[in-house]
A protein has these predicted regions:
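Left-handed beta-helix
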Residues: 14, 19-20, 25-26, 31-32, ...
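Residue-level preference for alpha-helix termini and adjacent loops
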Residues: 2-4, 24, 48
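Extreme N-terminal tail/first-helix region
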Residues: 1-16
């Protein structure tokens, strides 16, 4: 479900799949062919979240931000089940494993 937050609304334009139980909130930009799976929350209430094309955020994940600390997920990234990404940057063609926790200002490079 998409939710506006204040004056920001999600841009889910060409996403491949958003599960009915996923919540996309605020200033979120989903790239082409991106998927967000069941019971995942992507909440951009304090800063922007950008998820690149071809990426997938699997079941039960949380993607969030802090004030002035956006979350940026590159192209062709897989985020495994139950992961938490908070105010971090993940480079292109990367895999974030199941249950991983990435907190503010963490940077994961390309091809990781």
């Amino acid at each position: 479900m998409d939710y506006n937050y204040e004056d920001k609304q999600p841009d889910t334009g060409k996403a491949a799949f958003i599960a009915p139980s996923a919540d996309i909130i605020g200033d979120v930009i989903l790239g082409e062919d991106t998927s967000v799976w069941f019971n995942t929350t992507v909440r951009a209430d304090l800063a922007q979240i950008r998820i690149g094309r071809g990426s997938n955020i699997q079941d039960n994940c949380v993607v969030h931000v802090d004030e002035d600390t956006p979350t940026k997920i590159g192209d062709n990234v897989t985020v495994g089940h139950n992961a938490v990404l908070h105010g971090c940057t993940v480079g292109n063609n990367s895999l974030i494993g199941m249950g991983a926790i990435l907190l503010n200002n963490v940077v994961i490079g390309n091809e990781s």
